[in-house]
């Protein structure tokens, strides 16, 4: 049951359960002051919504409108809102104040007597928020270790041996008497020198891992690949066009080494180019993305508020200061009837 009384010196009583939360307005302003016109004192409204945790769904809210002892019936009626702690979320009709269990922050909007502060429903962001920084797109730098490994020294040593084989073969005078194309063109000499230089740079690059040394090794391997390709063509010409058995024997013995040199230089040049081209990602910027998560308790589902009157309680309200509106929540203990 509900009772309502209006008088100059009486405080009305409200029938409500024991768990009553009061939203009161403070800092009264006397009629006739600068903050309020003479003869017209408007108070911030506060609403009492009474609910019973034992009931499931009652759609019709019961609102008690009361006046303080100093205000007559023509002035603004203060109200208060009451809800039980057992209800997780209140789903009230449009215009009502909604609450979520575990949310303690109230968002108020500044205003005067005509625009009192109201509670804005929505997600409440508390101080205990977690933040994660998720960077997208990492900056890449040149890493010679991706190119220079233990195998590079072995490949360089093989290239040096192939170059020495070419030079030692060039000493044979019978190749020049039988008009060998590989010997007359000088491929056996300058080809062997290129192979020795590229192999030496590959071995040195394993010791000195500077970008300059790596670039030099890659460049010489590219040149050696071209030279070895030219040597393959010259040796094939000797095998096809020269009828002398000695020339065919020497050319056939060098051909596998030249093919091996071509394969080695192509492999080293390929991976070396990948290592040097890694520099194109150096100027790539890092873009972080901040993800903010609200760990506040959120309701698992909407519930309809229950409203009932089971006990007798006294409601005490005070007028509000329009210049600095504040809302305070107080719990009024039940008074036995």
Swiss-Prot record:
Coiled coil: none annotated. InterPro entries: CD20-like, MS4A. Keywords: Membrane, Transmembrane, Transmembrane helix. Signal peptide: none annotated. It holds the Pfam family CD20. It comes from the Eukaryota. Its main location: membrane. One of its GO terms (biological process) is cell surface receptor signaling pathway. GO terms for cellular component: plasma membrane. It is found in: Membrane. Residues 101-121 are annotated as: Disordered. The chain crosses the membrane at residues 155-175, 183-203, 220-240, 252-272. The keyword Magnesium does not apply. It is a multi-pass membrane protein. Belongs to the MS4A family. This is Membrane-spanning 4-domains subfamily A member 18. The lineage of its organism: Eukaryota, Metazoa, Chordata, Craniata, Vertebrata.
């Amino acid at each position: 049951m509900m009772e309502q009384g209006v008088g100059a010196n009486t405080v009305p009583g409200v029938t409500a359960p024991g768990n009553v939360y009061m939203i009161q307005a403070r800092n009264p302003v006397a009629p006739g002051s600068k903050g309020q016109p003479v003869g017209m004192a408007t108070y911030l409204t506060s609403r009492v919504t009474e609910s019973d945790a034992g009931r499931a769904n009652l759609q019709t809210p019961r609102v008690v409108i009361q006046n303080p002892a100093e205000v007559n019936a023509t002035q603004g009626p203060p109200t208060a809102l009451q809800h039980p702690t057992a209800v997780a979320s209140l789903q009230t009709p449009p215009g009502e104040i909604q609450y979520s269990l575990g949310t303690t922050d109230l968002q108020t909007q500044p205003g005067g007597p005509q625009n009192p502060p109201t509670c804005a429903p929505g997600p409440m962001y508390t101080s205990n928020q977690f933040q994660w920084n998720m960077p997208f797109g990492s900056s890449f730098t040149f890493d010679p270790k991706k190119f220079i490994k233990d195998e590079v020294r072995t490949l360089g040593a093989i290239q040096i041996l192939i170059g020495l084989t070419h030079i030692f073969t060039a000493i044979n005078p019978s190749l020049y008497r039988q008009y060998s194309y590989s010997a007359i063109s000088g491929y056996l000499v300058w080809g062997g020198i290129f192979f020795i230089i590229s192999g030496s740079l590959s071995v040195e690059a394993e010791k000195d891992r500077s970008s300059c040394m790596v670039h030099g090794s890659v460049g010489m391997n590219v040149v050696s690949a071209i030279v070895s390709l030219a040597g393959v063509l010259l040796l094939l010409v000797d095998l096809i066009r020269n009828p002398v058995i000695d020339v065919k024997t020497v050319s056939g013995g060098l051909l596998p080494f030249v093919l091996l040199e071509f394969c080695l230089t192509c492999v080293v040049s390929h991976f070396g180019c990948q290592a040097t081209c890694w520099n194109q990602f150096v100027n790539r910027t890092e873009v972080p993305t901040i993800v903010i998560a609200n760990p506040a308790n959120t309701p698992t589902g909407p519930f309809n508020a229950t409203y009932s009157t089971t006990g007798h309680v006294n409601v005490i309200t005070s007028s509000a200061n329009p210049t600095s509106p504040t809302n305070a929540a107080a719990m009024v203990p039940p008074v036995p009837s």
